């Protein structure tokens, strides 16, 4: 295993590699989360691939000092390209989860010739409209007791208190709990919340204009790389836009992982690993 920092777009970006074999860049979700929730689950894949994790700009162990003019989707894409160049890989297999799937799509649109295989796992929708529809459906899965607790956390100022980190983590876990096929699996999700989470969230607020109106559907035709679209059985996207998204990608296939939700690598690791390995080996 190797870990450290590299200067990317003038900012310190934390990265970690493990395993040997073809490189697989792993793009985490969020925004404002980091790579750590993939572990230890992804260590299984390190037996056959070189996994490249990194904390996105202003996330996790990466620097919060970012040029505000580049705090947009294009900036996240450029970060990946610089990471690829600095690590010396001609091409990358790219795995994007959730919010990371949106970044992965944007990267593949811009740098399709640098992508060997693309995996869009539980990805944000390719358009703001579809993303908003999915969020509305997903919100219906939060049970009444958890919703009451979320309301308390948000309405009583706990998120703005000096000791906000435990409440931020609790809020996220309650939200992600509703996105599990089996709510008990939330105990297997490891989240790291930095002490300066609020400041990092404020930096991500600069993404507002990009996330409010984006629509990638027309540009998905530019992605010629083999693409695997993965969703969990209980995700709203399966019945909303999964088919539409797959049809917009010229060289893609859709797989739905049974008995899983937004985190199939946690809930159904056997089927998840089988799908990923089979796809990358084709």
Across the structure, where does each feature detected by a protein language model lie?
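Active-site loop/oxyanion-hole signature of alpha/beta-hydrolase fold enzymes
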Residues: 53-99, 274
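Conserved HGGG/HGGXW glycine-rich cap/lid loop of the alpha/beta-hydrolase fold
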Residues: 5-65, 69
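Conserved alpha/beta-hydrolase catalytic His-Asp/Glu region
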Residues: 154-205, 209-210, 219
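Catalytic active-site module of serine/aspartate enzymes centered on a nucleophile-bearing elbow/loop
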Residues: 252-282
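Short beta-strand/loop motif that positions the catalytic acidic residue
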Residues: 223, 229-231
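Conserved hydrolase catalytic core segment
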Residues: 90-133
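Flexible "cap/lid" loop of the alpha/beta hydrolase fold
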Residues: 118-158
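Conserved alpha/beta-hydrolase "acid-adjacent" motif
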Residues: 236-241
């Amino acid at each position: 295993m190797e870990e450290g920092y590299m200067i990317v777009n003038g900012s310190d970006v934390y990265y970690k590699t493990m395993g040997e074999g073809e490189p697989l860049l792993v793009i985490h979700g969020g925004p404002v989360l980091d790579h750590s929730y993939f572990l230890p689950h992804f260590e299984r894949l390190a037996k056959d691939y070189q996994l490249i994790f990194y904390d996105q700009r202003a996330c996790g162990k990466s620097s919060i000092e970012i040029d505000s003019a580049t705090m947009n989707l294009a900036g996240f894409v450029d970060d990946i390209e610089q990471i690829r160049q600095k690590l010396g890989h001609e091409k990358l297999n790219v795995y994007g989860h959730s919010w990371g799937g949106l970044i992965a799509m944007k990267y593949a649109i811009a740098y399709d010739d640098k992508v060997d295989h693309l995996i869009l796992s539980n990805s944000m929708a390719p358009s703001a409209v579809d993303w908003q529809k999915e969020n509305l459906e997903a919100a219906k899965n939060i049970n009444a007791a958890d919703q009451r607790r979320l309301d308390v956390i948000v309405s009583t100022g706990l998120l703005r208190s000096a000791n906000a980190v435990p409440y931020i983590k609790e809020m996220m876990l309650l939200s992600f709990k509703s996105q599990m096929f089996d709510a008990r699996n939330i105990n297997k999700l490891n989240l790291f919340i930095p002490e300066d989470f609020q400041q990092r969230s404020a930096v991500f607020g600069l993404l507002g204009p990009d996330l409010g109106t984006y629509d990638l559907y027309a540009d998905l035709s530019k992605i010629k790389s083999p693409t695997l679209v993965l969703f969990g059985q209980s995700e709203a996207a399966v019945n909303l836009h999964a088919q539409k998204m797959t049809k917009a990608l010229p060289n893609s296939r859709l797989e739905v992982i049974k008995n899983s939700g937004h985190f199939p690598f946690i809930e159904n690791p056997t089927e998840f690993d089988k799908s990923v390995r089979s796809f990358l080996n084709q």
